């Protein structure tokens, strides 16, 4: 399955520390390999069509993604600082998901 990365997500990932980037790449590789079957602790469904890729470490990194047209799309990334997903981050991911649906 192909993985498409939003340019903003790519910038976000490349700005992280090298060690964290390696963990992100490893986790994205797991997503590519296991697709829908990838579950906790690496992936969690957060809404009907939106999933959260969870990268644990010195920083808690979250990447929102979806499955669309037999591909995986990485929509948004952020550093998680609290227990709940910030609404601002969720809204942005849902907006990008909506854009995919209109294409």
Residue map of PLM features:
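Short, conserved beta-strand/beta-arch hydrophobic-aromatic motifs that form part
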Residues: 62-63, 76
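Short glycine/proline-enriched loop/turn "hinge" motifs that connect secondary-structure elements
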Residues: 57, 64-67
């Amino acid at each position: 399955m192909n993985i498409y990365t939003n340019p903003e997500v790519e910038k976000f990932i490349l700005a992280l520390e090298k060690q964290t980037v390696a963990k992100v790449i490893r986790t994205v590789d797991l997503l590519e390999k296991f697709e829908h079957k990838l579950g906790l602790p690496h992936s969690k469904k957060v809404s009907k069509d939106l999933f959260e890729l969870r990268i644990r470490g010195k920083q808690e990194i979250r990447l929102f993604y979806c499955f669309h047209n037999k591909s995986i799309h990485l929509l948004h990334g952020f550093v998680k600082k609290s227990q709940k997903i910030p609404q601002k981050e969720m809204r942005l991911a849902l907006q990008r998901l909506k854009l995919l649906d209109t294409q």
